Amino acid sequence: MLNIFKNIRPFTSYCLYDWANSPFSTVVITFVFASYFEKAIVGDPEKASIMWGWAISFSAILIAIFSPFIGRHIDKNFSHKFWLILFTFISSVGAALLWFAYPIESSVVFVLSILVISNLSFELGGVVYNSLIPNFAIKNKIGEISGKAWAAGYLGGIVCLVIILFGFIQTESPLFGINKDNAANIRVAGPFVALWFILF
């Protein structure tokens, strides 16, 4: 197995990054916060779905605009580490700020703003992350290595989601003494994802 890598340590770090960042997509974008936004903040599933979709679409447009410039810049200046840390920091802070997404309609603009900014940073971080693989992988094994990292990310997203669901949301006694007032046991998913991202 080791012969498919130039260096096993960068490969491990590469997989751990995928393990660390996937919960953002799983918990914030797809499951927990999307559902919370729909049911607790907006209260109208159809309206909430449209707003959530527009926010994701807007961030996707920004990603398409900025990605080529970011890619060109980091390739020219070899500043991969700086930009990866910056985008990771921004998306982590965005996830953490979702703690303040109280279950009231006035939270709509706040949540959607955080969603656009953090998803933009998350995806741009992915651009930088994907550009790193040729630095340590043998050329004809890049696909295999990318697949292993994706698997690690998929697993990380599931593990984090399970912890949040059964440790905070679907339990009478949420972890760390978190109560259910103002949906604190759901809002904590944001900071938990941020902590997961930073720790790994």
Report residues per predicted region.
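Loop-to-transmembrane helix entry/capping segments in MFS-fold secondary transporters
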Residues: E46-I50, A137-W150, I186
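Helix-loop boundary and gating motifs at the non-cytosolic
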Residues: L2-I63, V109
